UniProtKB/Swiss-Prot annotation:
The gene is SHO1. The keyword Transmembrane applies. The lineage of its organism: Eukaryota, Fungi, Dikarya, Basidiomycota, Ustilaginomycotina. This is High osmolarity signaling protein SHO1. PANTHER family: ACTIN CYTOSKELETON-REGULATORY COMPLEX PROTEIN SLA1 (PTHR15735:SF19), FCH AND DOUBLE SH3 DOMAINS PROTEIN (PTHR15735). Residues 42-52, 105-111 are extracellular.
Amino acid sequence: MPSKRGGSGGLDIGLIFAHKILTVLFILSTVGWIVAFIGQCAAEADGVGRQGVLWFAIFLQLFLIIGKYLGVMSDSLGTSRLQLTAFTAVALVFSVFGINSGIYSSNSADEAVAAGWFLITIANVIWLLFLTTEEDSVLYPIVNIANAGITPPAARTSSRYNGAGGAGSGGQSMRMAGSGGVGTGLGGGYGAGNGSAYGGFQGGSGYQPAYGNSPSAADITTANGTGLGAPKISSASIRSRGANDAGATQDAPSVASHGAPASPAQVGSKSTDLPDYGYKARALYAYQANADDPTEISFSKGEVLDIVDNSGKWWQARRSNGETGIVPSNYMQLL
């Protein structure tokens, strides 16, 4: 899988034209920058007026334009969203100063400066809306109305982080429709405040074993190593504080005195049948799984996946190579 969400991890100049609104913004900002720069040079040469701080502004705007070009061509605007937003806001203030410096002047060079900065101001305002609009906003479908392949900057953030920590909803809220999860019987389950309740995949910011023999999230895997379905617990996963802790429930896997793992029959006794993948969905964008979350899977743009259930923000999916895991629903389109 690629290391970036944009596909091959390289630069694709065709992506500049994949989002029609961004294409117009690039034209406005590039033409505006050229006009403003030539106007400032002419104004300085004529000795009509010193441009002063506008020289800083013009080069700040140049670096922003280049950075946005690179971000779009690599489809990585989401990774630099905060930096681009901050510097675009600063550049917007300077662009207004640029308009004010020459709009009332009778000198043609100053008028060119004002005209150039006016085009840049329009581009900066729309860029700020594009970079800061979240998926739940009414502006989101508007700023992405002509998008034919660019990953929206807010897509990854809002699909993975859906609230603060707490009982039942953590920093990484995951929903997996399907069965085969681990119940509350594993060593008494996890703590309510920082818990990670597997089987519904409502994950908290972390977990604390309430009792002695609780396995870690990374140790709960299936035979195919995907982290879904019935648990398979190795001897290294046992956090032992006592052979027969009072908090262990009847559903907890038995552990021998020498730390041997429970038999597959004992561990899988509570598991259910394999989930039915009744839907198919095509990936609208490429996605790289979070390295800290073993339940997520990566996929490429245009890839078709099998889906268990199409409800919720995270879907249980299976790739063509048999790999299973959860995927963000806003990256998928049902077929």
